[in-house]
Amino acid sequence: MITPIIAGNXKLVNTISEE
């Protein structure tokens, strides 16, 4: 599952979570 998260720098980052 690809979960879009907002990093502390404000940039939008897509993290791949294998769940």
From Swiss-Prot:
EC number: 5.3.1.1
Keywords for this protein: Cytoplasm, Gluconeogenesis, Glycolysis, Isomerase
A biological-process GO annotation: gluconeogenesis
GO MF, any single term: triose-phosphate isomerase activity
Location, primary (coarse class): cytoplasm
Catalytic activity: D-glyceraldehyde 3-phosphate = dihydroxyacetone phosphate
Pathway terms, separated by semicolons: Carbohydrate biosynthesis; gluconeogenesis; Carbohydrate degradation; glycolysis; D-glyceraldehyde 3-phosphate from glycerone phosphate: step 1/1
Binding annotation for substrate: 9, 11
GO CC field: cytoplasm
Transmembrane segments: none
UniProt subcellular location: Cytoplasm
Subunit architecture: Homodimer.
Family: Belongs to the triosephosphate isomerase family.
The name this protein goes by in its record: Triosephosphate isomerase
Organism: Clostridium pasteurianum
Organism taxonomic ancestry: Bacteria, Bacillati, Bacillota, Clostridia, Eubacteriales
Gene name as annotated: tpiA
